């Protein structure tokens, strides 16, 4: 891949040895169908299992590795800073996000949006976690009115310029679409 990537997919990983190879394959398959130059960036957030070892030899892959666990947002930040694509896609390293949904995000971006957020429609979390998440999303949606169903879903697509306007910290990936909407970006 010598072309400048159009798409950069950034995935933070923490103790995902059982998922990482299958996830990489699904990402590459989804991106190859799009037919645009891409890069895949995995950020190992100080995993204590064999995640880092399982990443070795995967191609195409750019790997960023932390010596210790700094948290998901720090991993997203490192991956986004390493990304060179015009469109940056984020998703979790666990199987909650299906890379096959990436083309759906891009189709929405083709409608003129700057940020498109995914939705974990069939979440595999315990009932109470889903309940509190849905309640928080409902309250946030009533306050911000951004139309986002699942702000905690890490599957999102952003135009590169979005990250020139915002400093990443804490758990803010949940609130980035709302903050960017307040800055005038088109969010879906």
Name every feature range the model reports, one short phrase each.
Residues 6-8, 39:
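Cell-envelope/extracellular polymer assembly enzymes that use nucleotide-activated donors
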Residues 16-31:
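Short, well-formed alpha-helical segments that are part of the catalytic scaffolds
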Residues 16-19, 47, 98:
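Donor nucleotide-sugar binding loop of glycosyltransferases
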Residues 24, 28, 36-46, 64:
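Short beta-strand/loop segment that forms part of the nucleotide-sugar
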Residues 44-52, 95-96:
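A conserved acidic beta->alpha catalytic loop
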Residues 62-68, 72-82, 99-182:
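Acceptor/aglycone-binding surface of glycosyltransferases and processive sugar-polymer synthases
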Residues 66, 91-93:
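Catalytic metal- and UDP-sugar-binding loop of GT-A-like glycosyltransferases, i.e.
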Residues 88:
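Short aromatic/hydrophobic "clamp" motif used to bind/position activated sugar donors
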């Amino acid at each position: 891949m010598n072309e400048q990537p159009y798409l950069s997919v950034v995935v933070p990983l923490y103790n995902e040895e059982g998922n990482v190879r299958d996830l990489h394959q699904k990402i590459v398959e989804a991106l190859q169908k799009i037919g645009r130059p891409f890069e895949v960036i995995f950020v190992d957030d100080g995993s204590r299992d064999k995640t880092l070892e399982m990443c070795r030899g995967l191609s195409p892959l750019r790997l960023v590795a932390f010596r210790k666990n700094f948290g998901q947002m720090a991993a997203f930040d490192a991956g986004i800073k390493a990304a060179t694509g015009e469109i940056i896609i984020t998703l979790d390293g666990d199987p909650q996000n299906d890379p096959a949904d990436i083309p759906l995000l891009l189709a929405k971006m083709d409608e003129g949006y700057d940020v498109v957020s995914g939705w974990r429609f069939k979440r595999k979390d315990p009932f109470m976690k889903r309940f509190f998440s849905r309640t928080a999303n409902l309250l946030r949606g009533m306050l911000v009115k951004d139309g986002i169903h699942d702000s905690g879903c890490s599957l999102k697509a952003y135009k590169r310029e979005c990250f020139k306007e915002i400093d990443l910290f804490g758990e803010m990936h949940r609130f980035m679409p709302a903050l960017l909407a307040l800055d005038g970006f088109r969010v879906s």
